Amino acid sequence: MKLRSGEAYWLLKNGIINSYPSLRENIVCDVLIVGGGITGSLIAFQLSGEGYKVVVIDKRDVSLGSTCATTALLQYEIDEPLYRLIDIVGKEAATDSYKEGIASIRKLERLVYKMGKDCGFESKASCYVAHDSESMERLSKEFESRHSMGIDVTWLTEWQLWNQYAVNGMGAILSRSGASVDSYRLAHNLIAYATRHYGLKVYDHTEAVDFEYDTRKNYVYTDDSFLITADSIVYATGYETKDLLNDKIVNLNSTYACVSEPIINLPKHLSNTIFWDTQDPYLYLRSTSDNRIIVGGADEPFHNAKRRDSIIEKKGFALMEMFGEFMPTMNIIPDFCWAGTYGVTKDSLPFIGPHPDFPRSYFVLGFGGNGITFSIMGMKIISDALAGRSNKFLEYFKFER
């Protein structure tokens, strides 16, 4: 599956950071992680750091799938508002999922500090804007729901929103628990640290093409006919997992993004806040460490790569128009535009944990607008699953829900 197209900003900015060899021999490991994007790198960092003998394989170069196309806003907010999620999955599961998102962003901040390498991580506020009067009623209800659950939020009136941020909206929820990151560089940093300090092994251009199981082991055959014998497998294959599972667990769409030219004297409110609104599909934006603005959205309900690619330019103009309406006093010049695949689940929660059709195997599928945050949650969830420890999120995020 072609996961991205156009000039993905993170790849253009960073180039190929590290390359790894393809697998050229039969190997044995404790845990095989299939997928070397941001999810696979987070899980590999966690498990190798706990002493497991971990191998990561990726059919591309590390993080050249959807990881280098994501806009990498880090949000605790889930695509399904809290008050609606409570109706779908219950108060405890919904509230726990939101609060764990906050904890995950702080966890990543500590992890980045531990590695000591720049990946563009910046803690930011998050501003969720009502774009019309009807959505303001829903957003007001969402504010009350979050506030009643002890989440630190502030309500901004239309006047406050304009006065503080020059944003055109009817009102907004302001949260202190957001961030942004260069996800492509972060993934490379995680893998480099784990290979250097924890003995992680990584193989690029190595595709798993066949899987066999017995009562004790998993046997994975690669496209070059080498064998990987693993006690456990973790699938971190993102949207391509749809081709592996018979279950219809996600609807795939196309999403678009543009990054501006660098902005001299970028306003502080743009550098320290991420924004998104209540439109469907919603508009979202963030700044980068080199003073650009990334604008994303304009989703389409298909994922055919040829069709998606054919309208990148058109979608770029649409995003610029949407940005102009959202922040009319700010003028930006687009530099690069690109497209990627985006998925949504029935309840906007991820699928993390075992699957009945895959013995001794686990999936970390952080679908949705805050997929990176879900993947950070997956670090502890998969660690607990492998060790036989209980974890309530294994129940919340299971396939059979």
Predicted regions and their residues:
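Glycine-rich active-site loop/strand segments that organize a redox cofactor
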Residues: 70-100
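Glycine-rich FAD pyrophosphate-binding loop
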Residues: 49-69
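C-terminal catalytic lobe of FAD-dependent flavoproteins
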Residues: 309, 324-401
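Active-site substrate-recognition segment that forms the wall
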Residues: 106, 114-122, 208-213, 226-357
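Extreme N-terminal leader/targeting segments of oxidoreductases
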Residues: 1-31
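N-terminal Rossmann-like FAD-binding beta1-loop-alpha1 element of flavoenzymes
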Residues: 27-56
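Helical element adjacent to the flavin cofactor pocket in flavoenzyme catalytic cores
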Residues: 172-231
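Flavin (FAD/FMN) cofactor-binding and adjacent substrate-gating region
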Residues: 2-13, 80-86, 110-189
